[in-house]
């Protein structure tokens, strides 16, 4: 008899294909509960957690998250994600994504070009892109170096101060173009607004405060995931 082996997780792109609920969180340095929070979020049905500490309470209290500390936080997230089959995303930094062994690198419009980021992280890391208008979404939908894109902000949000909300029209136009790769709506999304978003054609979402500020993050994630799955 051959010894049994633990089931290997699916490659990141295969898990991306079924992902519906994407969470951005800061490192929660002022609370010191990142691993516990991530455990609750993944248990509630979050598929992807991105670490994004810009503008966070921890940054205000302790200063910018340095590379060593970011790698430590990502290691915490990866340990939890591994238990749940979830994905861990790095924001902006291709070098950090490579060093951390992250599943996903997410790039903004002002970050490294996707083709150059791909040279750094290699062929297996999922690369995502933020888009804020129809033209950017259209380009992201056909860029061979991008695996998914986010479009928004649908509604104004304090996590992106100064960025004008794109509204549901951007969601509708993106849905109507029938992209062949996964795309997520982002910006000001919560359980109350989710029906409008689903009606506009989105079936994948990125949230922040809807889970990070919830009294019960696991329950908040479960409610969002249930609504997404019920509509699919």
Curated annotation (Swiss-Prot):
Cofactor(s), names only, from the UniProt record: Mg(2+)
GO biological process assignments: thiamine biosynthetic process; thiamine diphosphate biosynthetic process
Residues given in the record as Mg(2+) binding sites: 92, 111
Cofactor notes: Binds 1 Mg(2+) ion per subunit.
EC number: 2.5.1.3
Broad class of enzyme this protein falls into: transferase
Keywords tagged on the record: Magnesium, Metal-binding, Thiamine biosynthesis, Transferase
Binding site for 4-amino-2-methyl-5-(diphosphooxymethyl)pyrimidine: 50-54, 91, 130, 160
Positions that bind 2-[(2R,5Z)-2-carboxy-4-methylthiazol-5(2H)-ylidene]ethyl phosphate: 157-159, 188
Pathway the protein acts in: Cofactor biosynthesis; thiamine diphosphate biosynthesis; thiamine phosphate from 4-amino-2-methyl-5-diphosphomethylpyrimidine and 4-methyl-5-(2-phosphoethyl)-thiazole: step 1/1
Gene Ontology molecular function, alphabetical: magnesium ion binding; thiamine-phosphate diphosphorylase activity
GO CC, one annotated term: cytoplasm
Reaction equation(s) it catalyzes: 2-[(2R,5Z)-2-carboxy-4-methylthiazol-5(2H)-ylidene]ethyl phosphate + 4-amino-2-methyl-5-(diphosphooxymethyl)pyrimidine + 2 H(+) = thiamine phosphate + CO2 + diphosphate; 2-(2-carboxy-4-methylthiazol-5-yl)ethyl phosphate + 4-amino-2-methyl-5-(diphosphooxymethyl)pyrimidine + 2 H(+) = thiamine phosphate + CO2 + diphosphate; 4-methyl-5-(2-phosphooxyethyl)-thiazole + 4-amino-2-methyl-5-(diphosphooxymethyl)pyrimidine + H(+) = thiamine phosphate + diphosphate
PANTHER family for this protein: THIAMINE-PHOSPHATE PYROPHOSPHORYLASE, THIAMINE-PHOSPHATE SYNTHASE
Similarity annotation: Belongs to the thiamine-phosphate synthase family.
Role summary: Condenses 4-methyl-5-(beta-hydroxyethyl)thiazole monophosphate (THZ-P) and 2-methyl-4-amino-5-hydroxymethyl pyrimidine pyrophosphate (HMP-PP) to form thiamine monophosphate (TMP).
This protein's name: Thiamine-phosphate synthase
Organism of provenance: Nocardia farcinica (strain IFM 10152)
